[in-house]
Amino acid sequence: MNQTRVFLIFAWLMVAALLWMEWGKDKAAANAPTPIASQAVPAARDPDAAAPAANVPSAQAIPQAGSPAAVPGTSTTTATATPVAAGAAPAITLTSDVLRLKLDGRSVLDAELLQFPQTKDGTEPVKLLTEDAAHPYNATSGWASERSPVPGVGGFRAEQPGTTFELAKGQNTLVVPFVWNGPNGVSIRRIFTLQRGSYAISIKDEVINKSDAAWNGYVFRKLSRVPTILSRGMTNPDSFSFNGATWYSPQEGYERRAFKDYMDDGGLNRQITGGWVALLQHHFFTAWIPQKDQASLYVLAQDGPRDVAELRGPAFTVAPGQSASTEARLWVGPKLVSLLAKEDVKGLDRVVDYSRFSIMAIIGQGLFWVLSHLHSFLHNWGWAIIGLVLLLRLALYPLSAAQYKSGAKMRRFQPRLAQLKERYGDDRQKYQQATMELFKKEKINPMGGCLPLLIQMPIFFALYWVLVESVELRQAPWLGWIQDLTARDPYFILPVLNIAIMWATQKLTPTPGMDPMQAKMMQFMPLVFGVMMAFMPAGLVLYWVVNGGLGLLIQWWMIRQHGEKPSKIIQANAK
């Protein structure tokens, strides 16, 4: 099978996949399920003050700290809703070198990523968590109980005076303690810790019982969001990157649920020890990461228009004069592979969603590993992309050679195949039998060009998603006119080069026996794909240009290696 057919098959598959995604979005919009009924979104500032949504386990099903609980059922009993505390404390702002958080001690209401501007030339940072009225997105850690007092919305108060706390120059850690003082001597001390250069926020709670009775309750950690409506389009990576909830357990591995069909498979009610739960979008995500040795009930639910991903538990019984503690990390930030690795959380690297399938994700991770090492040497993501394509082409050269060798052998026997077709006329059975005998006699494998293609396809599909999903490439320049690899080429130079390379490759490709109508259609393919790619991210088009250019050189070399003349092929295709 020749190089152009390899390219065109891959391109057709890409277009088919993109069209399928578009159709899926339209179908989902037309047949969107009515959200599961639950309590209305409360008017209070903290959106999670309401009781949990219906069809979730009872408080008794929450795993107890330090003891394995049975996997819960689906009782609809819920814990008592937590009221807004009288005289709620004002919101507090915490600022590190990478994060600016607005919180009330219970919920992170607003989060800005200070090192990620919304636009290439802008100064406004990406806002991941937000109090936006239309599309609120919050992270909450609270306590619930059916019998004992717990903090209400706004119940936590900063121990230190002031409403603004900032990581000072020369400091590596910002520690801000909060406290809730309940009735009868029960208190909960909460400590927020931010580290320089990190998007992981440590939240540690200590329940101190100085009352005369046992205190019972469980901690819950929740991500709640009204998903934004993304502008649809095949050239907009935001619209076909995965947007939804993901979670990980040591037993089941990585799983996910898209916002558009959030409750199609019902709510998630599963007890997991360790693991994590996250809400993903293109380039960024939020996640709750509990302690590895503590069990939680993982829940997916809907609360009115909000999609909720929640961890419930562990539950604690704190005797008089005793205390108990629990800790978790809240990630609010980009999908930076280097920083995710520092968290040392199993499976967290899967939030860089190269694929929902493990084998494709492994291929993508391997390709990014090579790409990042090339970047550490070249210090430019554009040149790193070019270097990666060069390495892939070198590694896959034996397969390309096998493809062309198989195709060249088939072309040499085209006259004999034509004779067989003329001899047997419309008797297809005899024609096929004679053809197979010829293949067997001459040791021709008609599928010889397909096997190398099947091996190459997963690699190039994975590379496509690596370039789409890697936040490291976001707003990264290459050279000259390409100042953002995730934006389209402003002068369409790369798309024009891509059209020229595809046209030249097509002219250099032998097409014996091709139907005249098919041949005419093929002549328009470079223009069709060139126009389609004109509005795609420049990094992707750069990949296509380099890959196509190398393919053209390999095609020329293969033709000469097998005793064929490029000029004759070009003349034959011009007829």
Curated annotation (Swiss-Prot):
InterPro entries: Membr_insert_YidC, Membr_insert_YidC_N, YidC/ALB3/OXA1/COX18, YidC/Oxa/ALB_C, YidC_ALB_C, YidC_periplasmic_sf. Pfam families: 60KD_IMP, YidC_periplas. The chain crosses the membrane at residues 6-26, 357-377, 381-401, 448-468, 490-510, 526-546. It is a multi-pass membrane protein. Gene3D superfamilies: 2.70.98.90. GO terms for cellular component: plasma membrane. One of its GO terms (biological process) is protein transport. One of its GO terms (molecular function) is membrane insertase activity. Keywords: Cell inner membrane, Cell membrane, Chaperone, Membrane, Protein transport, Transmembrane, Transmembrane helix, Transport. It comes from the Bacteria. CDD domains: 5TM_YidC_Alb3, EcYidC-like_peri. It is found in: Cell inner membrane. Its main location: membrane. PANTHER family: CYTOCHROME C OXIDASE ASSEMBLY PROTEIN COX18, MITOCHONDRIAL, OXA1. Interacts with the Sec translocase complex via SecD. Specifically interacts with transmembrane segments of nascent integral membrane proteins during membrane integration. Belongs to the OXA1/ALB3/YidC family. Type 1 subfamily. Required for the insertion and/or proper folding and/or complex formation of integral membrane proteins into the membrane. Involved in integration of membrane proteins that insert both dependently and independently of the Sec translocase complex, as well as at least some lipoproteins. Aids folding of multispanning membrane proteins. This is Membrane protein insertase YidC. It comes from Xanthomonas campestris pv. campestris (strain B100). The gene is yidC.
